Amino acid sequence: MRVAIVGASGAVGQEFLRVLDERNFPIDELLLFGSQRSAGTKYTFRGKEIEVKLLQHNDDFKGVDIAFTSAGGGTSKDFAETITKHGAVMIDNSSAFRMDEDVPLVVPECNAQDALNRPRGIIANPNCTTIMMVVALQALENISHIRRIHVASYQAASGAGAA
């Protein structure tokens, strides 16, 4: 499987690398993409050194099966067509597509089946607070129907992922 990570040098991109390795995700080829600032940076993944490529509107995503994106909403929106035009499934970690009716908003523990219906080739995930909440609520819903819930959430001043 050919896998790409967009925003590979950021905190979330680095976490993608760690989790993919930790869970022994089946990867034949890993492509890393980033900004002008991070292009050329090298990371080691499963004993192999991989250089971050500059993210551009070209055919670099041809043959990619899955692209994990964590470079911010603007970048996700700007590059979505470039990433998906050759059939890659884009799994976006930004807020860019969370309200798009043609993009499933998926928390695998709760609605994994929704990921199968992706007219635009994109899967979005909710805000991190929402993810934790709905996983817990799903367990409660399995026991007894929840009619209503009131939630207050306090968010970090920066969603960048690093202090």
Where do the language-model regions lie?
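N-terminal Rossmann-like NAD(P) cofactor-binding subdomain of oxidoreductases
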Residues: 1-163
